[in-house]
Amino acid sequence: MNCYEHTIIAKQDLQESQVKKIIEKYETLIKKNSGKIIKTEEWGLRNFARKIKNNRKGFYFHIKFDGSGKTIEELERAENIDEMLIRYLTVRVKKHDFEENFFEKKDS
């Protein structure tokens, strides 16, 4: 199995319950396709530098998981037809980094 990091951006006009359902949907999809969830992070509502598909903001989620090519194939197939999503990105990494969350608010 390979290590992956997957980021999803969902539309800004979703309610909190819809956001939770999206996360659960894709976590379940990863598990059903022989993947193993390592960590899921909600980065919250963030502004875009420019409009993307007529949206100025989006909800960001980040999932770290172990999986195979089949897992990625099924994940991205489902995301292509999901109208609640704006963008997604899957990156293969050598190992999962647990040291720092770049979007975590830090106290000064």
Tell me the role of every PLM-derived stretch.
Residues N2-S108:
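Structured, basic alpha/beta domains of bacterial-type, RNA-associated proteins
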